[in-house]
Amino acid sequence: MREITPKRIMEMKGKEKITMITAYDYPSALLADKAGFDIVFVGDSLGMVVYGEQNTLNVTMDQMIFHTRAVAKAVKRALVLADMPFGSYEVSVEEGVKNAIKLIQAGADAVKIEGGYDHRKLVKKLVRMGIPVMGHTGLTPQRYLRLGGYRIMGENEEEVEEILRDAKALEKAGAFAVVLEFVLADVAKLVTEEVSIPTIGIGSGPYVDGQVLVWHDVLGLYESSPPFAKRYANLREEILRAISEFRKEVKEGKFPGKEHYWEYQDKETFNRIKENVMRKLRL
């Protein structure tokens, strides 16, 4: 069992800020764990930042299992959280249970489900089975078509009520935490105060119990990123510089240098071997 558990995450509410970052492969997960994050999250955002999709709707269970397995192999300390992709739990509770089990078998410690009140029965069932669940309300990317696109949530009474109802339903169903995405900070603060489980914000202000960002946004791997994401590096430019230099050195015959390859020191030995090989192959 990893050091950080759902129980530990729940105990951090109001005491210590929870840190969460996405990771989609072995090397990024190694670094995230070494950096000390509490939660390493295999998000369905991989559809957009890894596979180039316009949204997360085309992400499959096979993709989530594949990436979860890679991340789980790397992480020794943090809690590994895996997203339930669109279509993996909407049809029925039974279908959701089957797919959640697959992610746990791939190495996840917990699963995340978008939505709250509408999926309370699934959350309750999974928790009873011993599968920890994190909920997700506010802007739910898997339902962005219904929401009218990617936009800030909580701008009217109806949305505030829905967000709070989702969070309370998740709490009652046994979820150990809830993500609040792109929610007005005042609303996120209200939810945080009204539920006993931790709230983890993304684009939802400082009044939550923790924060999550996408790996590629933190490192500046793309030209643009969401307005709520802070860039802590500009690796896109550094990577572009490095690979461009590699290409240039190959074109100019500068790579590989003598320190990057090995050859026979005794050329007579090689020439003898060469002659024998050529003769055997009749070249």
Swiss-Prot record:
It is an enzyme of class 2 (transferase). Its cofactor is Mg(2+). Its EC number is 2.1.2.11. It catalyses: 3-methyl-2-oxobutanoate + (6R)-5,10-methylene-5,6,7,8-tetrahydrofolate + H2O = 2-dehydropantoate + (6S)-5,6,7,8-tetrahydrofolate. Mg(2+) binds at residues 44, 83, 114. The active site is at 181 (proton acceptor). 3-methyl-2-oxobutanoate binds at residues 44-45, 83, 112. Pathway: Cofactor biosynthesis; coenzyme A biosynthesis. Binds 1 Mg(2+) ion per subunit. InterPro entries: Pantoate_hydroxy_MeTrfase, Pyrv/PenolPyrv_kinase-like_dom, Pyrv_kinase-like_dom_sf. It is found in: Cytoplasm. One of its GO terms (cellular component) is cytoplasm. Transmembrane segments: none annotated. One of its GO terms (biological process) is coenzyme A biosynthetic process. Keywords: Coenzyme A biosynthesis, Cytoplasm, Magnesium, Metal-binding, Transferase. SUPFAM superfamilies: Phosphoenolpyruvate/pyruvate domain. GO terms for molecular function: 3-methyl-2-oxobutanoate hydroxymethyltransferase activity; magnesium ion binding. HAMAP family: PanB. Homodecamer; pentamer of dimers. Catalyzes the reversible reaction in which hydroxymethyl group from 5,10-methylenetetrahydrofolate is transferred onto alpha-ketoisovalerate to form ketopantoate. Belongs to the PanB family. This is 3-methyl-2-oxobutanoate hydroxymethyltransferase. The gene is panB.
